[in-house]
Amino acid sequence: MKDVVIVGALRTPIGCFRGALAGHSAVELGSLVVKALIERTGVPAYAVDEVILGQVLTAGAGQNPARQSAIKGGLPNSVSAITINDVCGSGLKALHLATQAIQCGEADIVIAGGQENMSRAPHVLTDSRTGAQLGNSQLVDSLVHDGLWDAFNDYHIGVTAENLAREYGISRQLQDAYALSSQQKARAAIDAGRFKDEIVPVMTQSNGQTLVVDTDEQPRTDASAEGLARLNPSFDSLGSVTAGNASSINDGAAAVMMMSEAKARALNLPVLARIRAFASVGVDPALMGIAPVYATRRCLERVGWQLAEVDLIEANEAFAAQALSVGKMLEWDERRVNVNGGAIALGHPIGASGCRILVSLVHEMVKRNARKGLATLCIGGGQGVALTIERDE
């Protein structure tokens, strides 16, 4: 099979819920990244074979949002596109599908990633088609129902984090300390400009003025142990998961340009990283956050690596309880994990996050001249994904 490489990796800044990017649809955000990948790599738009983008919240978004992003991003009508929904893993699963297409010879160049605007997810009337003949109708929040609700246990996925905290003995103090560390690492990374190479600025309007958004909006400058300790539990009055030690609701997009190694050589493009292996697993939905343990083990087994060999890891922080449970099971070196902060600080635009962590991983590996990297996420509904990449020595 053909070797698959990444030659471009970009993302938008991550916007707060109803924040700086709220006025831009997921398609608009995704199209900016598609356009920037073409411009920065110099690959002719007509040479792209397919676009694969994850998006979870598609109610009201129009037909095939990935196709919309491709065309709006400057690709010709001849380039096909597909939108996928693997919840939080969508953006990473898109890379897996792209890898398979290239390995099988069905495509030479694919743009893969994810996009999401959680701020614009609509409320829906589920009985409007059949009609409510008498009485009131209830609006359903598609953001929660389609993105954050466990369909099997009929509760918010935050409850699954409480389940993990009890199962693995993760205290409130440990969760808050983890969350504060994520905030501190993210703020230090932003202050040092470590994300600048991966971010595509977004032009937006505010009070009649044009603003350039080029920095992640979510990280807190005022995060403190005392402030985190004052927050009430969000999902269980006697629990430990709070808004401060959980990931947030966000807007953003991320994508990579992938191609066969032979095509990269023919186009004289530098290789940022090689795709080595991918794995997906299923677990009990009530303990969905532990799935990265099994996805990571399967992925490492497929590539023939030991965890200790991996130089850098990006593991999506759905909740501090979840991240700590995974770390406890895998016994990985925390100094190699989410070195610039994770989703608790940076945010979690669900359809984009899988690719966002991969983009950040690639750029940090380049900066550190690291060789082996791992990206992994848990997925609402009881699944997990992992992907390994490698850079040449």
UniProtKB/Swiss-Prot annotation:
InterPro entries tied to this protein: Thiolase, Thiolase-like, Thiolase_acyl_enz_int_AS, Thiolase_AS, Thiolase_C, Thiolase_CS, Thiolase_N
Chief subcellular location: cytoplasm
Pfam family, one: Thiolase_N
A GO CC term assigned to this protein in UniProt: cytoplasm
Record keywords, A-Z: Acyltransferase, Cytoplasm, Transferase
Domain of life: Bacteria
Transmembrane regions: none
EC number, UniProt record: 2.3.1.9
Any one GO biological process: 1-butanol biosynthetic process
Reactions listed under catalytic activity: 2 acetyl-CoA = acetoacetyl-CoA + CoA
Localization, UniProt: Cytoplasm
Signal peptide: none
Alphabetical list of PROSITE patterns matching this protein: THIOLASE_1 (PS00098), THIOLASE_2 (PS00737), THIOLASE_3 (PS00099)
Any one GO molecular function term: acetyl-CoA C-acyltransferase activity
Keyword Transferase tagged: yes
Family label: Belongs to the thiolase-like superfamily. Thiolase family.
Name of the protein: Probable acetyl-CoA acetyltransferase
Organism: Escherichia coli (strain K12)
This protein's encoding gene: yqeF
